[in-house]
Amino acid sequence: MSTELQNTIENNDIRESQMWNSKELKEAIKEIEKMFGKGSIMVLGQSDNLNIETFSSGSLLLDNALGIGGYPKGRIIEIYGPESSGKTTLSLHAICEVQKLGGIAAFIDAEHSLEPKYCQTLGIDTNKLLVSQPDNGEQALDILEMLINSNSIDLIVVDSVAALVPKTELDGEMSDQSIGLQARMMSKALRKLNWLIAKSNTTVIFINQLREKIGVIFGNPETTTGGKALKFFSSIRLEVRKAENILNNYEIIGNKIKIKVVKNKTAIPFKTTTISLLYNKGIDKLGELVDLLVSYEIIEKSGVWYSYQNEKIGQGRTSVIQWLNADENRINELTEQVKKLIKQD
């Protein structure tokens, strides 16, 4: 290292030391904490917020694509896509995972379409799920705010943004113009809710639908409902689309859905994954586990043969699923092993 470069580094270190020991800075920090409370200003490297708290999405493949092992706590998440693409099912799986951890979840059913039996099929304890079916958009957002302010809810799902119709529009005539009412309502609400969500550490999932913009010749004509505020305030945006049917002896038993992480403020964005949703079962968790065990080389695959710790399991993916099903403890141990590897990636 040259003498000139060494002197420059030493001078920078001296200036940095003087800055941190500055009497004026210490007084300013003291005054800020006095006025706004302890923790209102902090050193990022010494902050408790350095490590993002998460909970599983219910899909190991999606947890992997999210980059932090699941959904972040205290953030806004938007899940959008065409109709019948699996958006609500994904959200219900998130509720199930929160309940497994002993947390409390709520579902704001603006579409008035939640099926209790389907929730139970996915593993949700419906006796511990709070549900609201609001009359209009303002009422839904007021209920959302009150639940967040309780500081007792871990996850709230709003289904859907498209169904959050402003009261003015509902009370008016069919011929009345209502351009921009919903967008203004969402923008006003989210400016306030964003801070409350972070403070309460509540995760809020907004389910949204796609619409086509009129007159678009070049570029993508598709857009989400509710204006641009939700796009801005969301930490994660997931685009969900149906990819193909899952067949068993020519019978359709489910769908494969492609998920793209369009926005991610917590990790690398634009990752994609494809997960399987089975009818009356939801996410094919064992199938995902098998794929990840092979991907991380925990289970070895040679041709059609699978083996674990030098012991042959059998031929084909189905034999591995049967091998896992035979021992619940084995499933739990290997799942935890995969989760640790996902967080390390």
UniProtKB/Swiss-Prot annotation:
The species this protein belongs to is Mycoplasma mycoides
Q: Which GO terms describe its cellular component?
A: cytosol
User: Which one Pfam family would you cite for this protein?
Assistant: RecA_C
Which branch of life, at top level?
Bacteria
State what this protein does: Can catalyze the hydrolysis of ATP in the presence of single-stranded DNA, the ATP-dependent uptake of single-stranded DNA by duplex DNA, and the ATP-dependent hybridization of homologous single-stranded DNAs. It interacts with LexA causing its activation and leading to its autocatalytic cleavage.
**Family from the record:** Belongs to the RecA family.
User: Could you tell me what this protein is called?
Assistant: Protein RecA
A GO biological process of this protein is: SOS response
Keywords, sorted A to Z: ATP-binding, Cytoplasm, DNA damage, DNA recombination, DNA repair, DNA-binding, Nucleotide-binding, SOS response
